[in-house]
Amino acid sequence: MPLLNPAASRVIDPVLSSVAQGYKHPGMVASALFPQVNVPLRGGKIITFGKEDFMLYNAGRAPGENTKRVSFGYSAGDYALSDYSLEGTVPIENLQEGLNGPGIDHAALAINRVQAIMALRLEKQAADIACAAGSYASANKTTLTSTAQWSDYTGVSQPTRVIETAKEAVRAATGKVPNTIVMGAKVFSALKNHPVIIDRIKYTGRDVVTVELLAALFDVQRVLVGGAIYSNDAGTAFTDVWGKFVVVAYTELGSVADMGAPSYGYTYNLNGYPLVEEPYYDRNAKSWIYPVTRAEAPVLASASAGYLITTAVA
């Protein structure tokens, strides 16, 4: 009997895989800093960008002279996708009860719950990358302390000035004006009541500070609040994924075909993933099992396209 290769031995359910691939968790913000780029291989080179767009080239050409050439984008470092697999379980009791109740799609429910768990893992992984101060040059990061923190309302802290400093640092390093701000939930809570912010919006006719108002105030396309939390193994303590950090960045959707554009980061995702294998019945557990697999890796493509604010609040 011939040996089966991995592609032949795994039976994929295309309908359930489409459910997994279409899943979007409303509370996760990692994709704003690390937009997904589908790749055909599990490993390759991270596409990085240099200063070619900003150089003054002598494009003049004398008769018979060779035309000058310009290359854009280059490989710097390697990426390797990691596989993550979990199985969603649907006891037959749930299916039996569902037959006599409302039309609940238990398969989709199980897959989406698994996807939510995996999305939280990716969110934490991306946040750890984005909030690692060691990845940034000294001009692209700051740590706020004492009365400079945005939770201090004594008149010293100036969040708008800090954001402007961050935006200028990114523009000076990349030529791109930041379009995205991601902040932890505690930071957003402090900004909603900050006197400087309240004073700036008092003429807008709005009484409540929203992310849309902050985006307009900071002059960026979008402000996103990372509200995700994770628990310890015992489930007795919970921690904010994005903590007290703020990341100001330029991000852009791209593809491998056009090599994207100078951007803060990407999430490399294997073509066709996430996928759901054909469900099977576990007699011992008396349950239907739905295996879900993802192959992905968030990478920081250009730290100079970002600015990290640490301990923005106390």
Which residues make up each language-model segment?
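Short, surface-exposed beta-edge/turn micro-motifs
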Residues: V177-T180, K244-V246
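Alpha-helical scaffold segments that mediate packing/assembly in large oligomeric complexes
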Residues: I92-V177, A185-D199, V313-A314
